[in-house]
Amino acid sequence: MSNRKDLLSVLDFTVNDVGNIIELAGQYLENKAANGRILENKTVINLFFEDSTRTLTSFEMAAKSLGANVVTLPVKSSSINKGEDLTDMIKTLNAMNPDYIVVRQKSSGIVNMLAKHVSCLLINAGDGSSEHPTQALADYFVISSHKKQIKNLKIVICGDILHSRVARSNIRLLKMFGAKICLVAPPTLICKHFPEVDSIYYSLIEGIKDADVIMLLRLQKERMNSGCFIPSNREYFYLYGLDSQKLLCAKSNAIVMHPGPINRGIEISSDITDHIILQQVEFGLAIRKAVLHYYRPC
């Protein structure tokens, strides 16, 4: 167990790790990866305590395409609903000797506790507002496919920064490669405690000036308490929603990204092309194949 390497945070990556995973993902994207059944006779358990379309489906498709036996546990009908403690549940699953457990949980940091109770490899598929490392890898992959290098790119992340695990993971990963990170959000949804951030704006038009990449985030109302003041949907779109007119403030070759799910008319208008956003989904599948491959147990 001491030799295993979990994937819980972007901070678990070295620069070499990222390069190797991106190289593998490129091979999977082009269907050129050798030994496509590399996970044959391996078992992957997907344990998702939050709703998911993109991440769950892509992890399941990735594992199956690599030859793994895949178990996606229906949490809503599991023993958790009979009062079983989460630690006991993870120990029970670990006793079945899977090779991977892929976890999404609504509580920030919970994956670090769970990792102490398993002998298999644990992959964080999103924990509360904390981290989403494979989404950050997918976003890095997309950006690097459109831009010559990450260094010195002005990357603007706009939206509900406070509650976003995608923002946290992207900030850390992209800064590792020298990007200039700018945040745009309402004052009540910003987080000022990122040493990696270069600038903060409370106006989208000001923030995206000369931007190379604009990454939009949805309002995560399910994580907000009743005392969290936010603009109405209409006000939010007026101030922080991106449309084709506001996009003119960015560089002419700027790319627009969104990790999904998208709320049209709130953070983005329908007149913005979603080509890159769909590419994030496509590249996300290749990244998850690469991650399962790269971290495969001996």
UniProtKB/Swiss-Prot annotation:
PROSITE patterns for this protein: CARBAMOYLTRANSFERASE
Positions annotated to bind carbamoyl phosphate: 54-55, 104, 132, 135, 260-261
Gene Ontology biological process terms in this record: 'de novo' pyrimidine nucleobase biosynthetic process; 'de novo' UMP biosynthetic process; amino acid metabolic process
Record field: catalytic activity: carbamoyl phosphate + L-aspartate = N-carbamoyl-L-aspartate + phosphate + H(+)
Source superkingdom: Bacteria
InterPro entries, sorted: Asp/Orn_carbamoyltranf_P-bd (IPR006132), Asp/Orn_carbamoylTrfase (IPR006130), Asp/Orn_carbamoylTrfase_sf (IPR036901), Asp_carbamoyltransf (IPR002082), Asp_carbamoyltransf_Asp/Orn-bd (IPR006131)
Annotated positions binding L-aspartate: 82, 165, 218
Keywords carried by this UniProt record: Pyrimidine biosynthesis, Transferase
EC number: 2.1.3.2
GO molecular function, one term: amino acid binding
GO cellular component: cytosol
Pathway the protein takes part in: Pyrimidine metabolism; UMP biosynthesis via de novo pathway; (S)-dihydroorotate from bicarbonate: step 2/3
Transferase keyword on record: yes
Top-level EC class as recorded in UniProt: transferase
Role of this protein: Catalyzes the condensation of carbamoyl phosphate and aspartate to form carbamoyl aspartate and inorganic phosphate, the committed step in the de novo pyrimidine nucleotide biosynthesis pathway.
UniProt xrefs under NCBIfam families: asp_carb_tr (TIGR00670), PRK00856.1 (NF002032)
Subunit note: Heterododecamer (2C3:3R2) of six catalytic PyrB chains organized as two trimers (C3), and six regulatory PyrI chains organized as three dimers (R2).
Full protein name: Aspartate carbamoyltransferase catalytic subunit
